């Protein structure tokens, strides 16, 4: 990709000083991106310039975007990529959460509601609101699929074999939602209370829905999922919030 820097600069009417600035910025850009452009690498570049002054950041973004468009025009790139200055870059935490042993989450318990809530988060990476919105009609246990409909769109998620018995048990007598009373979904506080009671009963007091979801993220990353793949699974608009898990 570096070999296209000079033809790109030559295609623009630039002063000598501007040419030097373009050349410097693009050499840095190509050094980080390499020969293959993808969203993950662009996010890394976004991070690398995050602490620059606003004017310097805008200059580098503008230069990189012009170069990306040029590469797309000459068909070096099959897709058009664009960096934006509105992307929020997450700071890397010094200590990432560790993967916990979740075997105890699957053992028999009297707190079956809280158990199923926690398993749906652990197994599928759902948020509490997504768990609350699971409709009976969108659960296909024969084909082991959940169709999740939210304001962000529709996602089809595979259900693991180990999750099926827990779902079968709680589907009995349900009219509209997996978690309901006479067809009306339970409140947000209801979910919070049942989850809190269950995790406390198995010795994980303080383990929140957010931390359970983080366990899903860590396991999927360990399984080899890319940041883009994981972002799609979670239904995120952007993978930016996942960056901290992909930094070494």
UniProtKB/Swiss-Prot annotation:
The keyword Cell division is annotated on this UniProt entry: no
Compartment annotation: Cytoplasm
Active-site residue list: 149, 213, 245 (o-(3'-phospho-dna)-tyrosine intermediate)
Gene Ontology cellular-component terms listed: cytoplasm
GO BP, one annotated term: DNA transposition
Major site of localization recorded for this protein: cytoplasm
Pfam name, any one: Phage_integrase
Domain of life: Bacteria
PROSITE patterns registered for this protein in UniProt: CB, TYR_RECOMBINASE
Single GO MF descriptor: tyrosine-based site-specific recombinase activity
Domain Core-binding (CB): 1-72
Keywords attached to this entry: Cytoplasm, DNA integration, DNA recombination, DNA-binding
Keyword Metal-binding in annotation: no
Domain Tyr recombinase: 85-248
Cited function: Putative tyrosine recombinase. Not involved in the cutting and rejoining of the recombining DNA molecules on dif(SL) site.
Family in the record: Belongs to the 'phage' integrase family. XerD-like subfamily.
Protein name per Swiss-Prot or TrEMBL: Tyrosine recombinase XerD-like
